[in-house]
């Protein structure tokens, strides 16, 4: 079988390439502009070419690949952003990825890429009175897709247009690994340009949980908040209870006591979504010593665990120097949960390998 290849736009810290490599797909090139993110990825994928700014690339003049992945900027689509949607300065870069895909397909007789994967925040389904997501579907398919009769986009769906077979699904990272990851709801859209395999890739059941065993330290695990079976050496049971900074500030600002109290969460809650703009604190104590606990922020390594990434994935750049904490937290807040990406890459490898 011919080797499957991948190109990653808006690459970030290389989560899609990592997921691809683990499923036998070779990352060939990436496009990213943040220096530390590029350096982190170069360390892990020294043979992957870095092409730079997407706005300066011609899809017809770069190496064709079987799969193109992209998590285009979400700032203008997010419900905590400025809500300018696909017209916003950053989120409009979505169309640059579509342009590159079309240029590549035009240059090689519509053979490559066979598959495209788009990832974004669920706010994209609400942005612009839900018309921005319609624009996304039309940009991929080239079809005049109607707005659903309900006026709302479902969390999962399929469309077949003249350009591609398309499926989307909202995945929440907390359900895709054991120990439990942070809460992270994201849209994953798969477009199949050479067949009708999008639904097979995105909806077919596959194993996703990893055997984690017992943790041997009292530091926050991927289960960040909650596990009664999280037992450290010495049999002490640590407890982690996350806070929601947004709710806490909102409750204080609006003098809403119930909102403020809900910000403290429950021991059974997953850790809140990691954001590039802020960290969520959490209370940490041992079950046999609640008074001896503390409130702290997760470490960079703990944030990597909450995203399902290998420990110290973001610690060093290509030159071996440590990446500063602020830039590591920002990169992780912008990243994709690895188990979700790996599930999709497994589906692509299976579908294209037939």
Language-model segments: residues:
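Conserved proline-anchored active-site loop of SAM-dependent methyltransferases
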Residues: 6-20, 54, 64-81, 115-122, ...
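Conserved SAM-binding strand-loop segment of SAM-dependent methyltransferases
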Residues: 47-53
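The conserved SAM/SAH-binding core of class I Rossmann-like methyltransferase domains
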Residues: 30-31
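Conserved SAM/SAH-binding beta-strand->alpha-helix loop
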Residues: 34
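A short, Lys/Arg-enriched amphipathic alpha-helix followed by its capping loop at the start of a domain
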Residues: 15, 19-26, 44
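C-terminal target-recognition/interaction regions appended to catalytic cores
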Residues: 229-354
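Conserved SAM-binding loop
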Residues: 41
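Class I S-adenosyl-L-methionine
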Residues: 57-65, 79-273, 277, 294-296
């Amino acid at each position: 079988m011919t080797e499957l290849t991948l190109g990653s736009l808006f690459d970030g810290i290389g989560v899609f390439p990592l997921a691809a490599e683990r499923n036998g797909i070779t990352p060939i090139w990436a496009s990213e502009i943040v220096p530390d993110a590029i350096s982190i990825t170069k360390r892990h994928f020294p043979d992957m070419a870095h092409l730079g700014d997407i706005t300066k690339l011609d899809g017809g003049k770069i190496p064709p690949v079987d799969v193109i992945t992209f998590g285009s900027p979400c700032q203008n689509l997010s419900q905590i952003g400025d809500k300018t949607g696909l017209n916003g300065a950053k989120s409009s870069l979505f169309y640059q990825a579509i342009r590159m895909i079309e240029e590549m397909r035009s240059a090689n007789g519509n053979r490559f890429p066979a598959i495209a994967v788009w990832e974004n925040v669920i706010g994209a389904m609400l942005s612009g009175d839900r018309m921005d997501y319609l624009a996304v579907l039309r940009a991929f398919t080239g079809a005049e897709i109607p707005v659903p009769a309900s006026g709302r986009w479902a969390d999962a769906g399929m469309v077949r247009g003249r350009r591609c077979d398309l499926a989307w699904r909202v995945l929440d990272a907390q359900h895709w690994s054991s120990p439990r990851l942070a809460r992270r709801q994201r849209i994953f859209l798969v477009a199949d340009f050479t067949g009708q395999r999008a639904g097979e890739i995105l909806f077919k059941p596959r194993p996703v949980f990893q055997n984690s065993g017992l943790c041997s330290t009292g530091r926050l695990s991927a289960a960040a908040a909650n596990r009664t079976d999280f037992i450290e050496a010495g049999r002490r049971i640590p407890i982690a209870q996350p806070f929601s900074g947004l709710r806490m500030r909102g409750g204080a600002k609006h003098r809403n006591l119930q909102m403020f109290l809900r910000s403290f969460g429950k021991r059974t809650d997953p850790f809140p979504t990691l954001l590039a703009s802020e960290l969520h604190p959490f209370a940490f104590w041992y079950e046999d010593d609640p008074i001896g606990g503390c409130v702290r922020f997760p470490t960079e390594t703990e944030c990597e665990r909450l995203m399902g990434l290998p420990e110290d994935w973001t610690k060093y750049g290509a030159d071996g120097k440590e990446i500063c904490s602020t830039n590591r937290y920002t990169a992780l807040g912008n990243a994709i949960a690895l188990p979700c990406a790996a599930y999709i890459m497994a589906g692509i490898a299976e579908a294209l390998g037939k």
